[in-house]
């Protein structure tokens, strides 16, 4: 779907092919030529298709190195926006983690890919002609996925790639699929022979004046599951043509009294952006609510073999109507309702990444 009109809640569908074609990642190499071995040139990522969204003040750019392949995706909010960070799992790759950001950088390359965020910071400083007044500081937070297992090089997103992703940023467009940070994302790592390539995904909803944009790069040990409970990406058995939920592999292992097999090197990174003003407590709870909801579309999620990070961002542009009965202590029913809707938008984004 290239355009997203104003939606009612009942219009959230998250449609995806019932039996998408297999996209096996192949066995990992865990090494190979690095950045210095190539004459690297950033490429603008266009992906499978372009999502069009209507969110003034928010631009997105994606760039990649074909030699990786690996990439970076930048969400740029020039005016800056308050941010809550929810990080879970056993191996989180995160820098910044600020409560106010001008850009969010998502990248491949594991910890090395955090350099892409430094490139975004450098570029923003140059745009301000190197002014460094405290109120003018440009804040960038970054999160990375471990994508080396799905490719045969040690190339990682560096400063030049982060700069390029920022330069490519435009309002109202997001490249779906194998693009930016999702170039070599994968899912279903019960066994390397059954791991499938995913990508990056986004979804957008507008409800009256309320805007919600979800962006995700699923690279989990788990599989991607649709709303019917069907595994649509990951843990694909080429001999049978069946995608299995990992729970069946784990059950068989316990029944046979052998350790369950699960491969390491997994992460899902995401951002949920809205224009609704929330208190700091509400924004933090909003982040937790949406992040927790993602276990429906990614199973299992937040494991010791993952390092999941979600950025919840608000541009603080509109206030939802309130009534004396709409709050419980410090938390508003409005924020809870917004989180419920945003959770569905995020599930749509996860499914887009799995197409």
From Swiss-Prot:
A molecular-function term among this protein's GO annotations: aminopeptidase activity
Assembly and interaction partners: Heterotetramer composed of 4 alpha/beta heterodimers. Exists at the monomer/dimer/trimer equilibrium in aqueous solution.
Protein name, UniProt field: 6-aminohexanoate-oligomer endohydrolase
Entry annotation: catalytic residues: 267 (nucleophile)
Function: Involved in the degradation of nylon-6 oligomers. Degrades cyclic and linear oligomers of 6-aminohexanoate (Ahx) with a degree of polymerization greater than three by an endo-type mode. Cannot use Ahx cyclic dimer or the Ahx linear dimer.
UniProt catalytic activity: [N-(6-aminohexanoyl)]n + H2O = [N-(6-aminohexanoyl)]n-x + [N-(6-aminohexanoyl)]x
Gene behind the chain: nylC
Mutagenesis / variant outcome for changing residue 122 to N: Increases thermostability by 18 degrees Celsius
Pfam families: Peptidase_S58 (PF03576)
pH dependence: Optimum pH is 6.5-7.5.
Leading EC class: hydrolase
GO BP term, example: nylon catabolic process
InterPro entries in alphabetical order: ArgJ-like_dom_sf, Peptidase_S58_DmpA
Entry keyword annotation includes Magnesium: no
Keyword Hydrolase appears in the UniProt entry: yes
Gene3D superfamilies, alphabetized: L-amino peptidase D-ALA esterase/amidase (3.60.70.12)
Family according to the record: Belongs to the peptidase S58 family.
Organism in which the protein naturally occurs: Paenarthrobacter ureafaciens
Signal peptide positions on this chain: none
Entries under PANTHER family matching the protein: BLR5678 PROTEIN, D-AMINOPEPTIDASE
Keywords: Hydrolase, Nylon degradation, Plasmid
């Amino acid at each position: 779907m290239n355009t997203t009109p104003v939606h009612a809640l009942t219009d959230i569908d998250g449609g995806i092919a019932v039996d998408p074609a297999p996209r096996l990642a192949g066995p990992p190499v865990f090494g190979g030529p690095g950045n210095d071995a190539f004459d690297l040139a950033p490429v603008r990522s266009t992906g499978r298709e372009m999502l069009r969204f209507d969110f003034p003040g928010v631009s997105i750019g994606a760039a990649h190195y074909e030699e990786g392949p690996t990439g970076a995706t930048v969400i740029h909010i020039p005016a800056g926006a308050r941010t809550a960070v929810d990080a879970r799992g056993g191996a989180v790759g995160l820098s910044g983690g600020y409560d106010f950001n001008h850009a969010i950088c998502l990248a491949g390359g594991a910890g090395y890919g955090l350099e892409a965020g430094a490139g975004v910071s450098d570029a923003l400083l140059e745009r301000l002609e190197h002014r460094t007044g405290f109120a003018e500081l440009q804040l960038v937070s970054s999160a990375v996925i471990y994508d080396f297992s799905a490719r045969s090089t040690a190339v990682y997103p560096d400063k030049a790639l982060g700069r390029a992703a920022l330069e490519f940023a435009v309002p109202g467009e997001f490249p779906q699929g194998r693009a930016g940070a999702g170039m070599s994302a994968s899912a279903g790592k019960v066994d390397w022979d059954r791991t499938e390539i995913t990508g990056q995904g986004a979804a957008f909803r507008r409800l009256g004046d309320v805007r919600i944009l979800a962006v995700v790069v699923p690279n989990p040990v788990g599989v991607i599951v649709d709303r019917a409970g069907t595994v649509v990406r990951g843990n694909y058995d080429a001999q049978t043509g069946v995608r299995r939920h990992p729970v069946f592999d784990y059950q068989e292992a316990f029944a046979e009294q052998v350790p369950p097999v699960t491969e390491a090197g997994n992460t899902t990174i995401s951002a949920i952006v809205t224009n609704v003003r929330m208190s700091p407590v509400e924004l933090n709870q909003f982040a937790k609510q949406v992040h927790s909801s993602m276990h429906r579309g990614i199973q299992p999620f937040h494991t010791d073999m993952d390092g999941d990070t979600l950025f919840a961002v608000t541009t603080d542009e509109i206030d939802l109507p309130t009534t004396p009965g709409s709050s419980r202590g410090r938390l508003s029913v409005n924020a809870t309702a917004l989180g419920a809707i945003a959770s569905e938008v995020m599930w749509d984004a996860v499914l887009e990444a799995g197409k």
